[in-house]
Amino acid sequence: MKKATFRKIIWANLILAVLILPKIIFYPYSLAPAELAKAMLLYDQLQPLDDTFVTIMLLLILIGYLVSLFLLYRFNDYGRQLYLVVNFIALFTYFSQGYVVFDSLEYVLDGISTIFIGFIIAIIYFSNLSKEFKKKK
């Protein structure tokens, strides 16, 4: 794989994340059926506010994700390690959340995002570009 292609994949992953965040934050159940959306909004209102630890972890994951993408774009070995750690921590923080309901658009975007994450991990560890990360600059 060429470096330019890998960099385009990094950009596509970043653009997808920028598209997903506003959808999840501001329009969480916009495409869900009316009864389900109403029930989930009521469920969300009954839940206590996220504790400080979870909020800090989510912010650290977001910052770590952006930094790791930048370092991967520059073919830095620390970016490769950080990307793996951030995605591993994000996986476990998803389990700390209660019920999660996806509408069809969120489901598709999350699936594409997961494919990108797996594809990037495969490229940075198992392709011929993995040697580029090990070079000292």
Question: Positions of the model-derived regions?
Answer:
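Topology signature of small-to-medium multi-pass alpha-helical membrane proteins
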Residues: M1-K137
